[in-house]
């Protein structure tokens, strides 16, 4: 049964009928490999893992029955591989967002959760912060020792805040999307909404049939140009936001987003012009 009537448009169809991945008693080698792949996919944000990067020692302990799936998840989350992908070079709020997504399968509900983990990280370090997710009653009640963490924010569950449904779609950008391959890079996705206690808009992921890649800059980006047009339905104005324009006069690194206001009748021509400059169009919305 679909999570919502718009499951295909929101990119959640892959999770509609998929049961949780669990390592059951009397498992086969194929079952074990399925669990290991699921852990890497979930905990590493669907980022590609080379054979040389796999945690062979932790996999061996799981294979020999020395550790549980929960402990294997802990080993991956504390590994240098995880730190290189999601800790180093990321804003700390972004790290916390990803920890919630990877380890508890949801987004932070409010700023108090972020503050708790910021304090824990500052006072006790990264490993202690990871332990606080995996040893929490929420993790135990949701996954126990043998179930691989999965995205729970798409469904209504006991103790879940309604705003969590909106928030998860700022972190989840499609089944095939990687947490390291998004236009916003290392910036926090939820800091502003959490600070203002505001529910964000649910925007379909970039791989759906009706959505462009979604990007919200850390500070509001004013339009660089507004092209005049006629009034009326055909003259509706759209806001095009782009990154990576390779021309003199445009920011190359620090301010990666540039916005244009374009009337409907000029929209197609303007998009083609921008693409010829090497720009990546990251959102097109009515102004």
From Swiss-Prot:
UniProt name for this protein: Phycobilisome 32.1 kDa linker polypeptide, phycocyanin-associated, rod
Keyword Membrane: yes
Domain of life the protein comes from: Bacteria
BP GO annotations: photosynthesis
Homology family: Belongs to the phycobilisome linker protein family.
Upper classification of the organism: Bacteria, Bacillati, Cyanobacteriota, Cyanophyceae, Acaryochloridales
InterPro entries (UniProt xref): CpcD-like_dom, PBS_linker_dom, PBS_linker_sf, Phycobilisome
Domain PBS-linker as annotated: residue spans: 2-180
Record's bilayer topology term: Peripheral membrane protein
Subcellular location: Cellular thylakoid membrane
Functional summary from the UniProt entry: Rod linker protein, associated with phycocyanin. Linker polypeptides determine the state of aggregation and the location of the disk-shaped phycobiliprotein units within the phycobilisome and modulate their spectroscopic properties in order to mediate a directed and optimal energy transfer.
GO annotation, cellular component aspect: phycobilisome; plasma membrane-derived thylakoid membrane
């Amino acid at each position: 049964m679909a999570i919502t009537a718009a499951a295909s448009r929101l990119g959640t169809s892959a999770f509609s009928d998929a049961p949780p991945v669990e390592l059951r008693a009397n498992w086969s080698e194929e079952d074990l490999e399925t669990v290991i792949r699921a852990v890497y996919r979930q905990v590493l944000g669907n980022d590609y893992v080379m054979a040389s990067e796999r945690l062979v020692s932790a996999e061996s302990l799981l294979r020999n029955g020395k550790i549980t799936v929960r402990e294997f998840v802990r080993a991956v989350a504390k590994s240098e591989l995880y730190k290189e992908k999601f800790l180093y070079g990321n804003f700390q709020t972004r790290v916390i967002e990803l920890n919630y997504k990877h380890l508890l399968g949801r987004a932070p509900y409010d700023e108090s959760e972020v503050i708790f983990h910021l304090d824990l990280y500052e006072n006790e370090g990264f490993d202690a912060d990871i332990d606080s997710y995996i040893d929490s009653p929420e993790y135990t009640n949701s996954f126990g020792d043998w179930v691989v963490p999965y995205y729970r924010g798409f469904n209504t569950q006991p103790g879940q805040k309604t705003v969590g449904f909106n928030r998860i779609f700022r972190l989840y950008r499609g089944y095939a999307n990687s947490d390291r391959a998004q236009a916003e890079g290392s910036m926090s996705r939820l800091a502003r909404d959490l600070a203002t206690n505001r529910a964000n808009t649910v925007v379909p992921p970039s791989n759906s049939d009706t959505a462009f890649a979604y990007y919200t800059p850390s500070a509001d980006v004013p339009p660089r140009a507004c092209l005049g047009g006629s009034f009326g339905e055909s003259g509706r104005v759209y806001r095009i936001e782009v990154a990576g324009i390779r021309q003199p006069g445009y920011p190359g690194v620090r301010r990666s987003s540039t916005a244009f206001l374009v009337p409907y009748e000029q929209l197609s021509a303007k998009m083609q012009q921008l693409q010829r400059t090497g720009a990546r169009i990251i959102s097109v919305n009515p102004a």
